């Protein structure tokens, strides 16, 4: 029986850091209030010229070096994110292009905080089925661009970054099993109120339209 194992890991955090002391200057909060309730002392924030795919690439390069694999070895890319560069093409294909990875299955999953868990579970099943030999799995967010910096209940919680692993086949158990689940009745506990079919015009992006090179 074929199992999957993590062959390499990598992470990337933007250089800019906002400490709790910095947050005290932005909203009515304190370092003590944040730490005692969340354990958070600081968070990293992407620069304006950084995209989620950039964070993914930086984390992926480290993971690939750690695993000793090259771009041509990758035959599956799965990324968990709710803050992609674009609605489409999906961010996995953008990362694929930036890293020079040859044609392979590449897709992203939108499951918020559990995105990386869903991504690694999906890649694990590809490997167990014998469809994949070397998977690049990434969880990444530039979530600070969705934050209300005047809402102290949320803005102190989130930061930007990316983590990546290389998943490979193994005769011995690496990932033993995964169990996925969701309960939609709690959908209003944490959400972003704008989507393509909901409130798009109200968000001020109604002039954005699909672009296509029709002859290609």
Task: Please name every model-derived segment.
Residues 1-21, 120-186:
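Conserved beta-strand-centric core segments of catalytic alpha/beta enzyme folds
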Residues 1-75, 195, 199-216:
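Conserved active-site "lid/cap" helical segment
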Residues 6-8, 34, 63, 74-77, ...:
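Buried hydrophobic positions in well-ordered alpha/beta secondary-structure cores of metabolic enzymes
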Residues 22-24, 28, 89-97, 192:
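Short, flexible, mixed-charge acidic loops at enzyme active sites
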Residues 35-54, 82-135:
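Conserved catalytic cysteine-centered active-site region
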Residues 57, 61-64, 156-216:
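Hydrophobic pocket-lining "lid/loop/helix" segments that shape and contact the acyl-thioester
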Residues 78-79, 137:
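Short beta-strand segments at enzyme active-site cores
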């Amino acid at each position: 029986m074929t199992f999957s194992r993590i062959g390499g890991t990598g992470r990337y955090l933007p250089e800019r850091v906002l400490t709790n002391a910095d947050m005290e200057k932005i909203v009515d909060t304190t370092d003590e209030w944040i730490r005692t309730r969340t354990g958070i002392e600081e968070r990293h924030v992407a620069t304006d010229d950084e995209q989620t795919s950039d964070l993914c690439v930086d984390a992926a390069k480290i993971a690939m070096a750690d695993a000793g694999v090259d771009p041509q070895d990758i035959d599956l890319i799965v990324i968990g994110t709710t803050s992609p560069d674009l609605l489409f093409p999906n961010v996995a294909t953008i990362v694929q292009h930036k890293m020079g990875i040859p044609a392979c299955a590449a897709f992203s999953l939108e499951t918020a905080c559990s995105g990386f868990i869903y991504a690694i579970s999906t890649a694990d099943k590809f490997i167990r089925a014998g469809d994949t030999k070397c998977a690049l799995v990434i969880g990444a967010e530039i979530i600070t661009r969705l934050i209300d910096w005047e809402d102290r209940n949320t803005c102190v919680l989130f930061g930007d970054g990316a983590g990546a692993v290389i998943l490979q086949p193994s005769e011995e158990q690496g990932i033993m099993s995964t169990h996925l689940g969701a309960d939609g009745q709690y959908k209003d506990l944490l959400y972003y109120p704008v989507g393509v079919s909901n409130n798009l015009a109200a968000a001020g992006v109604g002039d954005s339209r699909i672009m296509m090179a029709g002859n290609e």
